[in-house]
Structure formats: C-alpha cells, structure tokens
Regions:
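Positively charged, small/polar-rich N-terminal and surface patches that mediate targeting and assembly
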Residues: 1-109
C-alpha cells in the first residue's frame, strides 16, 4: 500500500469546517495549533496520512473549505512613532498551503 502524508496549513477560521468535513468522511488527522511567521496569525496544521488514491479527494475537501479573503491588518508607519502612527492595510489571508510527501513506512499500533 502506497501512503502519502498531507501537511495542510490552514487559517484558524477555516479549520473547523475542514476538520468537520474530514471527520464526516472518516479521514483521520492530527491537528496542531501553529502561528504564521509573516502575519503572526493563528493557523492550524493538519497532518493527514492517506492512501495514494485518496490524495486528490482530500485536497479537494481542503480547497473547498479554505477560502481566500482580504482582512485588515494594522501596520506601523515607523517603530519610533507613538500609537497614532498605526494605519490599517488589507492583506490576503485564508486559503491553504499544502505539502504532499511520500511515506516510506507506516505503522499503527
């Protein structure tokens, strides 16, 4: 049996729907709370071990429930400027970053 490891990094706001859908489809996963380095926003990293022929199905489920959207993000004009130096800018968030890797060995005890 050929196995793959899907590592999916999804926005915290999308994680609930993704996890619920995976559970409904009887796809097991491990959920880890993570934080992005650029926006410092909450993410969830899902580790999903599946058979090779299920990869496409799982990727479609993730894609369906991880919408990209614009959200406001406070920015600093200058580090030396007091609080009134902040302004808001919009950044693209959501979607998913997914890695699919080969699994050399799989054991379940």
């Amino acid at each position: 049996m050929i196995m793959k490891m899907i590592t999916a990094i999804v926005n915290k706001k999308d994680a609930g729907e993704v996890c619920d859908t995976l559970s409904e489809e009887k796809i097991t996963f491990t959920k880890i709370s993570t934080m992005g380095g650029f926006l410092k926003a909450g993410n969830v990293t899902l580790l999903i071990g599946v058979e090779d022929d299920k990869v496409g199905f799982v990727l479609e489920l993730i894609k369906k429930h991880c919408a990209k959207r614009m959200e406001p993000m406070p920015s600093v004009v200058n580090a030396g400027v007091p609080a009134f130096g902040y302004y808001k800018t919009e950044v693209l968030v959501g979607g998913a970053t997914v890695f699919v890797t080969n699994v050399e060995q799989f054991e379940k005890f």
